[in-house]
């Protein structure tokens, strides 16, 4: 997706992380690699395998209203991989399949909850004579995320949780672009809804590539990484007590904010190893607590990287979860 040369307000990736990942702390591996502190916000355009079905619509035909995909057994949340001989990765691929359509059923390959299925879909002509499917699809994602750490070669880890759909299923990412970004505002949380950072891409030129989407974060590589612009950081294990997060909530420069690590749990197979509470009055004044878009913010304790912010409590924006850094390293 091309980033247009204008201020573009971006939706922040949802802080939904339901996937499982095993844990085992290994300081020996961490000590052999030089890590650099993140805390900066990057913009992502992510290409996913297939096209996700996000809704249906009726097609007005000479014989009344029709909804071919819905009638063929396709469900919201399904991912379309193929239509006949056409591989589907974008809305344009769907259009191409319809342009080549002659008659009869199209055998459509979909993924539903991780299971591959074949369904038969019969396109219909609308009043203009064009074939339609009566479906809304999403073929790529755009958003902001906070980097947790970099390595010397420019590779980075961010978010601390997967990029998932509304059903909590991890997107199958096949690539994407990375852009510099700036934060231009915040929406503070309410008692029933999490707040979020608001930002925009800076420039049209990509500064890196997305490489993978995992249960413990979104990974990529910066093309021209300048290590002198980032602080070296050692790796350690979190324990209850005072700590800080390193996060960007205004502009492009990250700052340290005080938090308390309330609880640690290294036996849970999730992204919720740490319970944290914001204790920094300045941050609470600016944001009202942890916001969507802050996920991935490094958690620093005694000068060492111990984890990353992953979730916010909906009923208490000052509290949230963090992931142990070792999970992201592995």
Language model regions located:
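PDZ-domain C-terminal substructure recognizer with occasional recognition of PDZ-binding tails
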Residues: 32, 40-42, 75, 95-135
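Bacterial N-terminal signal peptides
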Residues: 11-22
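Bacterial N-terminal signal peptides that target proteins for export
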Residues: 2-12
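Serine endopeptidase catalytic core focused on the charge-relay Asp
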Residues: 124-288, 292, 301-302, 310, ...
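Sec-dependent signal peptide cleavage junction
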Residues: 20-40
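Conserved PDZ fold ligand-binding element
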Residues: 69-91, 299-302, 306-310
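PDZ/PDZ-like groove recognition
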Residues: 40-76
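PDZ domains, with a preference for the canonical peptide-binding region formed by the helix
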Residues: 82-113, 316-318, 323-327
């Amino acid at each position: 997706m091309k980033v247009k040369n204008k201020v573009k307000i971006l939706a922040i990736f949802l802080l939904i992380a339901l996937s499982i990942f095993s844990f085992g702390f290994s300081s020996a591996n961490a000590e052999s690699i030089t890590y650099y502190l993140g805390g900066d916000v990057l913009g992502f355009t992510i290409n996913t395998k297939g096209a996700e079905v996000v809704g249906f619509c009726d097609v007005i035909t000479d014989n009344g209203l029709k909804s071919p995909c819905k009638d063929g057994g396709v469900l919201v949340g399904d991912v379309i991989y193929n239509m006949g001989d056409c591989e589907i990765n974008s809305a344009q691929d769907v259009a191409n399949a319809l342009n080549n359509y002659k008659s009869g059923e199209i055998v459509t390959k979909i993924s539903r909850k991780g299971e591959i299925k074949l369904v038969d879909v019969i396109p219909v002509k609308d009043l203009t004579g064009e074939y339609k499917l009566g479906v809304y699809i999403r073929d790529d994602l755009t958003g902001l995320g906070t980097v947790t750490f970099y390595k010397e070669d420019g590779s980075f880890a961010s978010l601390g949780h997967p990029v998932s759909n509304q059903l909590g299923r991890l997107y199958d990412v096949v690539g994407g672009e990375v852009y510099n970004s700036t934060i231009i505002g915040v929406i503070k949380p309410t008692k029933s809804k999490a707040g979020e950072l608001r930002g925009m891409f800076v420039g049209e030129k990509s500064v890196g590539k997305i490489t993978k989407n995992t249960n413990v974060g979104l990974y990529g590589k910066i093309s021209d990484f300048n290590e002198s612009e980032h602080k070296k950081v050692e790796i350690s294990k979190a324990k209850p007590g005072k700590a800080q997060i390193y996060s960007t909530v205004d502009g492009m420069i990250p700052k340290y904010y005080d938090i308390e690590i309330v609880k640690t749990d290294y036996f849970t197979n999730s992204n919720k190893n740490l319970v944290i509470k914001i204790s920094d009055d300045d941050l609470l004044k600016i944001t009202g607590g942890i916001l969507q878009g802050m996920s991935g913010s490094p958690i620093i304790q005694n000068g060492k990287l111990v984890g990353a912010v992953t979730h916010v409590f909906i009923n208490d924006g000052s509290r949230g979860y963090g992931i142990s850094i070792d999970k992201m390293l592995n």
